[in-house]
Amino acid sequence: MDKVSADPENNEIYLAIAFNKILVFDREASGDTAPKRVLAGPDTQIRFTEQTVGSGDVLPVRVDPVRNLLVVKSQGLNRGDPGALLIFDRTASGNTKPLRVIKGPNAGIGGGGQIQITPAGWIVAGSSGGSIGVWNIMDNGDVPPKWRIPVLKLTGVGVNGVAIDSIHKEVFVPSGNGNTVSMFYFPEIF
């Protein structure tokens, strides 16, 4: 479900699909329903890898209902290029430019497909070097993460995603290659 984000406050569902699009549906829609909004086009900078089989390598999308924002993890233009975190107004549609873009060598957007947004406004996502990085939702440009968890160094296994537990102030990092879930107490981001 990391390719789908539900926004219970605004009663919407966001779905990232191949062909570099974000579809927005009414949460209560059923049947063959057209999306209420589509975010797509070259100005959006939304890029997923080429679709070859199945759904391709579609990256996650998350809604921040507190700040009325949408965060999309995008890939570089070419294979191996660093990725980006694209921050849009939640209601953006069409070929809309992001409000802010976090990308570049210092930003180090990297592996681990999932992203999360904490209630305090921190984006938690995969970072370079087998780590999890934490950026402020107001960051823009080639901004290094405020904090980094060096998961690979600490556990010996790579990053496959991220989940957060706001109640216990923890970050969970699963790893398929080690069949493990590592848990980190991280009160600073909650």
Question: Where in this protein do the model-derived segments appear?
Answer:
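Beta-rich, blade/repeat-based domains predominating
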Residues: M1-P8, P42-P65, Q75-L77, P105-W122, ...
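Beta-propeller fold detector
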Residues: T33-D43, T96-G104, V143-V151
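Blade-level signature of beta-propeller repeat domains, shared across WD40, Kelch, NHL, RCC1
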Residues: N160-F190
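Short loop/turn segments that connect beta-strands within the blades of beta-propeller domains
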Residues: E9, A18-F19, V66, D81, ...
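Short loop/turn segments immediately following beta-strands, especially the blade-tip
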Residues: V24-D32, I87-N95, V134-D142, F184-F190
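Short loop/turn segments immediately following the C-termini of beta-strands
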Residues: I17-F19, R27, S74-L77, R90, ...
